[in-house]
């Protein structure tokens, strides 16, 4: 979880400096590392980003151990992260970046409760 917390701190700093796309990317990675940490406690080690999302959905959301609304923040962040990192003509605006960072804060808080 330490890595997740670090990524969230970086996301907030990037946001403050106006680097919204990079902030979204780091906020997503905060959620990604938090999800991996919880999955590792169940001895589940997916090799891909989609695998982490899929397994997290199966092991935590489907089993009723994690709210779907908060999990949806993770899936949305993954889509925005791909757009931020690979989209040639996309622009992540301040409002969207703020929403993703707030989602990452909620996601990490919920993950911490389950450790």
What residue ranges belong to the model's regions?
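Terminal alpha-helical segments
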Residues: 1-115
């Amino acid at each position: 979880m330490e890595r997740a917390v670090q990524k969230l701190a970086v996301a907030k700093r990037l946001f403050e400096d106006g680097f919204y796309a990079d902030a979204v990317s780091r906020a997503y990675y905060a959620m990604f590392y938090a999800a991996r940490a919880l999955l590792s406690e169940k001895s589940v080690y997916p090799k891909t980003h989609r695998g982490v999302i899929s397994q997290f959905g199966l092991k935590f959301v489907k089993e009723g151990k994690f709210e779907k609304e908060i999990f949806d923040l993770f899936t949305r962040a993954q889509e925005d992260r791909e757009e931020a990192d690979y989209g040639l003509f996309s622009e992540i605006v301040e409002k969207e970046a703020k929403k993703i960072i707030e989602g990452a804060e909620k996601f990490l808080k919920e993950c911490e409760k389950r450790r």
